[in-house]
Amino acid sequence: MSATGKTVLLVEDNEDNRIVYSTILRHFGYHVTEALNGEEGIAKAKSEKPDLILMDISIPIIDGWEATQVLKHDPETRNIPIIALTAHALASDREKAMEVGCDGYLAKPCEPRAVVAEVQRFLGKGEPGAAGTAAGAGTAAPSRA
């Protein structure tokens, strides 16, 4: 179990982004699990019931928009906060994120600390150096416009 006791599911197909975001989240004491595509993300969300999901939008098999809709329409996962992580940075993309059920929105590239800040907004503060035991690495930065 992690120092915060909170689990974040990171749905991201880019290995560099997964390493950065998972590393910094673990540094702040969150347990991080990972999925490489929308289909795997949906399955892990349903089986593991994470406290929060960081959802890349441009992912294979099922994109992040559709995966979010599936999770928000499922009674078992609808209350899990989902933060969109996307290179789609237009105002219309932010609106679409909210329409499909995302609870937060971060435009890439984003500073690792911005990701942490956004996660903390939903889950509370973890402390630096309070790393959990899960493997992986990542950096995140908080921001919500």
Please state what every model-predicted region is:
Residues 60, 78, 90, 108:
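The feature encodes the CheY-like receiver
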Residues 110-119:
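C-terminal output helix
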Residues 12:
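Conserved acidic carboxylate
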Residues 15-33:
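Two-component/phosphorelay signaling modules centered on CheY-like receiver
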Residues 48-54, 59:
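Active-site beta3 strand of CheY-like receiver
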Residues 34, 59-62, 91, 99:
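Residue-level signal for the "D+5" position in two-component response regulator receiver
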